[in-house]
Amino acid sequence: MSLQWTAVATFLYAEVFVVLLLCIPFISPKRWQKIFKSRLVELVVSYGNTFFVVLIVILVLLVIDAVREIRKYDDVTEKVNLQNNPGAMEHFHMKLFRAQRNLYIAGFSLLLSFLLRRLVTLISQQATLLASNEAFKKQAESASEAAKKYMEENDQLKKGAAVDGGKLDVGNAEVKLEEENRSLKADLQKLKDELASTKQKLEKAENQVLAMRKQSEGLTKEYDRLLEEHAKLQAAVDGPTDKKEE
């Protein structure tokens, strides 16, 4: 394997490792969000868009080169005179196998680049939704406690007005308290609606993350299968070559 394809294969192994690491269930999205917001990661992300575009361009060029090589060595029987070159068939099959291997490596690297970027985005969105969900819960609880407090004060004022024989202007106080209660109830209902909307968004984000995890696991299994086929084909190609050398 040449130097460039060794680098691409190493990059593919690193992508598979990072995807599996992001799919670990016991690491919460909040912890990943803290890691993503660290200084080192932010420094990398500041140059990440340029690096991502350059990486995509390189991988696309490598995919095109691999496709060109496959088409070059595809019709072996039409291009090789087997009578004059008995060993040329094996040579062309080896070239075709390497071109197909390079296409798989470059294609999976390109696909996992988009998958990894999308997975990081979904994890960040899920962490943000979880944080906003907790904030809305706390805000709703504080509003509910304030409403209960005003209702208790209202009851106390009513009792005090009854004891004083109706001398106090209870009517105005009741109107103000009722207005405050209505305002608090409206705020509480608004917070409940926002909390329900946030829960729906959170469930949607969790479903997307789960789908991405299943897709990444499927890609990993497919890549393992291709590695096994690669090993079998390499053994099949190396076997006749070793016999000829002997």
Swiss-Prot record:
It comes from Pongo abelii (Sumatran orangutan). It is a multi-pass membrane protein. Belongs to the BCAP29/BCAP31 family. A motif (Di-lysine motif) lies at residues 243-246. Cleaved by CASP8 and other caspases. The chain crosses the membrane at residues 7-27, 44-64, 103-123. InterPro entries: BAP29/BAP31, BAP29/BAP31_N, Bap31/Bap29_C. This is B-cell receptor-associated protein 31. Residues 28-43, 124-246 are cytoplasmic. The keyword Transmembrane helix applies.
